[in-house]
Amino acid sequence: MCIRDRFTSLTKEALPIIRYRTRDLTRLLPGTARTMRRMEKITGRSDDMMIIRGVNVFPSQIEELILKRAELAPHYQCVLTREGPMDNLKVLIETKPGVAPDGIEARAAAKMLQHEIKVYIGSSVDIELKSEGGVERSQGKAKRVVDLRHK
């Protein structure tokens, strides 16, 4: 079932704002009345989605797995490239301060993360560990996806 969300202000404090097709990813919760449905928290945006070898991948899925690893910092970037007909995804991840990117524990964490991503998402990725500050930072919204594929 296709549902188009419409948002508006219900108070007199602001002008009514109506937005269509917000591209927010969420799901409707069971409601008590048809006109008063509630939504679960927004999990991401559909325009952040990457298609890798026919698999829909969201940066938030990768971030969820990164945050489970104690050796890795939450600073990452997904780099998309194309070699021949195949799309490749490389994830650049910073290690936490005091953890060397080429150290045994960091490499073990990267290998485990690579396996978890393959199982969870269904597509293999390359992991490249960087030291603190090695992943490009941006002002405002973090730039999580860099697409280097030729259009």
Where on the chain are the PLM-derived regions?
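Active-site glycine/GP-rich loop and adjacent strand/helix microenvironment
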Residues: 4-151
